[in-house]
Amino acid sequence: MFAFSKAPAGCSTYERVTQKFQDGSNKLRAAIEMDELTKQNGTINEKLQTAELYKQARQMLKEANEFNIMDIPESKRSEVREKREKTLNLEKSAQDRLIKICNEVDPNMKRASTAADPCRAARITPRNTRATVPGDKKVSKVKQTEKAPHVCSRGDRCGAHQPPPEKKSTPLKPVNQIRTRVKENKNPIGVQQQVFSFILSCCMRRNCRRPHYLFPCMISLKMNYFKFQATLPNQLNTVNRSNLLKGVDKAIGERLLDEILDSTGVRMDDVAGCHSAKATLEEAVILPALNPNLFSGLRQPVKGILLFGPPGNGKTLLAKAVAGESKQMFFNISASSLTSKWVGDSEKTIRGLFQIARNGQPSIIFIDEIDSILCERSEKDAEVSRRMKTEFLVQFDGATSSPDDRILVIGATNRPYELDDAVLRRFPKRIMLNLPDTEARKELITNTLKKHDMMDGLSSSDIRYIASNTSGFSNSDLVALCKEAAMVPVREIHRSKLSVTDGDKIRKIRASDFDTALRTIRPSTSDRILSKLSDFSRNFGC
């Protein structure tokens, strides 16, 4: 009915996106046509084929959105953005219809003929009478005519016709005796996904020779699988893109949506030390999500957290951990995200940022190096800079903001004493991430070496010795020290043998390698910076 072609390998990103969008639309149109034909009196097999078409259409439309907008020619970006918005709506419609079809099919339906003779229900479907799915290029080899006898692939479960008695096939094992290659898993959803994948591969492939009595089991698993997918607590999947951009200029909104971090792969356990900052972030982000009604009124979590301290002590890494563990919308904002060469665009961008955060709340806005944007106001400031700071303060906590807004702003800076007083007032939690102590240094060195499988040549006493000799080192200094120590065994290899040496044959790192590395890697934080940060923490810190 419809032809689904593949884009050429050497085509541009724009052509590939357009082709995938067209293929997904055609597949969805085929699914809708088959859905209309089978909505009233369709059989279970036909409805499952319709659901499979919807699933393929969703996958094609999802692939059409996997591109970088900067790879598209500037003259075509507006067209591609419109197609992306349309694609998201079509994908959502296909998902809703897919779940509805699974809900319509009763997995516990009793069939008298199957119960009376289970072997007859295990009849193999003849290849030349296989049902043709709309959009499939393969056509049945034998045309159905009025004189030809009707052969139904559903066997005795077909209410309109009976299978011819001369057609016989060897009965297969009942479904409860078939050995499925499913690994043991304590998670029931994981087991259902594996069983569903096995049955789907047996029943829905083109050269299917499996009996159709597997379909009732597949229906039950498919319903649970799609219901589980629909209830995943991912904030980005549950909020429609058009709802996020409500009340926001489209061009500015699309640029801000590119600043959203989906997943960073960093967890709280990856950050050594910083216990007070971890506890504060857990209290402000994770606990209110568990019981929002409890954290209301006077228990309402703070809306601003300022992380300050010497450079290289995990401020940005801690924000990445929050983005990785929380299911909230996370904006990673820098100075380049808010500034513009056009007059008035910076204020519009800030207003659009907070509007998108309100539309998708609960949400988190992380501003790295916040002192470059919100430093202390003075008479020497340019007019654009003053307007941008004023707009940020108004949107953060002004007349347009609401006390019920669940928006958390996290700022990170190495120079907190340069921030404006009004900015400090909007960050009630001001936490200093100081240089790691001995225990934190031991933990960081151990984690870094274990991550790269280089702990074999070192004992716990060696780690304790290294940590005691690295006083004043920041987290980034310790990582650089580990890298330098790992290079010491490599430097011992002669240059002529370096190209043919296997990495497994290099000797293990020893404590003496860290002594060698300490001669070149020195602390990067001066006493003057530490003194100024300590004074600020004593006067304004929490």
Curated annotation (Swiss-Prot):
SUPFAM superfamilies assigned to the protein according to its UniProt record, in alphabetical order: P-loop containing nucleoside triphosphate hydrolases (SSF52540)
Gene3D superfamilies in the cross-refs: 1.10.8.60, P-loop containing nucleotide triphosphate hydrolases
Keywords annotated in UniProt: ATP-binding, Coiled coil, Cytoplasm, Cytoskeleton, Isomerase, Microtubule, Nucleotide-binding
Top-level taxonomic group: Eukaryota
Pfam families cross-referenced by the UniProt entry: AAA, AAA_lid_3
Keyword flag Nucleotide-binding: yes
GO MF entry, a single one: ATP binding
Coiled coil feature spans: 29-66
Binding residue positions for ATP: 309-316
Compositionally biased tracts (Basic and acidic residues): 135-169
Alphabetical list of InterPro entries matching this protein: AAA+_ATPase (IPR003593), AAA_lid_3 (IPR041569), ATPase_AAA_core (IPR003959), ATPase_AAA_CS (IPR003960), MT-severing_AAA_ATPase (IPR050304), P-loop_NTPase (IPR027417)
Quaternary structure annotation from Swiss-Prot or TrEMBL: Homohexamer. The homohexamer is stabilized by ATP-binding. The homohexamer may adopt a ring conformation through which microtubules pass prior to being severed. Interacts with microtubules.
Function text: Severs microtubules, probably in an ATP-dependent fashion.
PANTHER family to which the protein is assigned, alphabetical: AAA DOMAIN-CONTAINING, SPASTIN
Family indicated by similarity: Belongs to the AAA ATPase family. Spastin subfamily.
Name of the protein this chain belongs to: Probable spastin homolog spas-1
Organism whose genome encodes this protein: Caenorhabditis briggsae
Organism placement in taxonomy: Eukaryota, Metazoa, Ecdysozoa, Nematoda, Chromadorea
Gene: spas-1
